[in-house]
C-alpha cells in the first residue's frame, strides 16, 4: 500500500523531471499584459508573464516552485527573460523575477537577455518569498539599478 508521503514524493519527482524537460526544450509559455494610462488612453509598457506549458503543473507558481526544487529556477527565469525581450522589442517592459534567482548570480551577467532590451525595463521581484529575503539580495538589486533598470515589488499587497 502506498502511503500519502510516498505519493507526494513520487509527484515531486515527476514535477522535477517535468521541469528538466521544460527547461531543456525551452518550452516556457509567455503572455503580455498591457500597462495602460487610462487617462491618456495609451499603453505605457507590457508586463511579461510566464505561463505554464506542462499539464502536470496547475499554475505558473507551481512550475517555478518545482524549478527551485530542481535547481533550475535561474535557467527557467532566463528563458522567460529571453522570450520576453525577443517578443516585445518595441515597448518598455516589466519582467518578473523569482527571488531565488539571486542565488545563482545570472541576473547581473552581461549576457543576460534583459540587457539586450532597448527600451526602459523594470525588474519586478515576485511576491513568492517573504520580504526578509530581499536583504540578502541587496548587492544584486543595487547592481541591476546601476545598469539603468528600475525595480519594483510585484503584488506588494500579497502579505509578505
Labelled PLM ranges:
Residues 127, 154-156:
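Walker B catalytic acidic pair
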Residues 54, 67-71, 99:
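Conserved protein-kinase N-lobe ATP-binding Lys motif
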Residues 44, 72-141, 149:
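Catalytic core of bacterial c-di-GMP phosphodiesterases, primarily the EAL and HD-GYP domains
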Residues 2-3, 16, 58-62, 68-88:
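Juxtadomain coupling helices with adjacent low-complexity linkers
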Residues 4-66, 153:
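Active-site core of bacterial EAL-family cyclic-dinucleotide phosphodiesterase domains
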Residues 59, 158-160:
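Interdomain coupling helix/linker and adjacent catalytic-core signature
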Residues 6, 22-24, 71, 125-128:
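Short, contiguous strand/loop micro-motifs
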Amino acid at each position: 500500500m502506498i502511503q500519502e508521503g510516498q505519493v507526494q514524493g513520487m509527484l515531486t519527482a515527476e514535477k522535477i523531471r517535468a521541469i528538466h524537460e521544460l527547461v531543456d526544450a525551452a518550452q516556457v509559455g509567455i503572455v503580455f499584459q498591457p500597462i495602460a494610462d487610462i487617462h491618456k488612453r495609451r499603453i505605457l509598457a507590457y508586463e511579461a508573464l510566464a505561463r505554464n506549458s506542462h499539464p502536470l503543473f496547475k499554475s505558473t507558481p507551481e512550475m517555478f516552485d518545482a524549478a527551485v526544487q530542481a535547481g533550475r529556477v535561474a535557467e527557467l527565469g532566463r528563458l522567460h527573460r529571453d522570450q520576453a525581450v525577443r517578443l516585445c522589442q518595441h515597448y518598455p517592459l516589466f519582467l518578473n523575477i523569482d527571488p531565488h534567482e539571486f542565488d545563482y548570480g545570472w541576473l547581473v551577467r552581461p549576457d543576460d537577455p534583459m540587457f539586450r532590451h532597448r527600451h526602459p525595463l523594470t525588474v519586478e521581484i515576485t511576491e513568492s518569498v517573504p520580504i526578509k529575503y530581499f536583504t540578502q539580495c541587496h548587492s544584486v538589486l543595487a547592481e541591476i539599478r546601476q545598469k539603468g533598470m528600475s525595480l519594483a515589488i510585484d503584488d506588494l499587497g500579497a502579505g509578505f
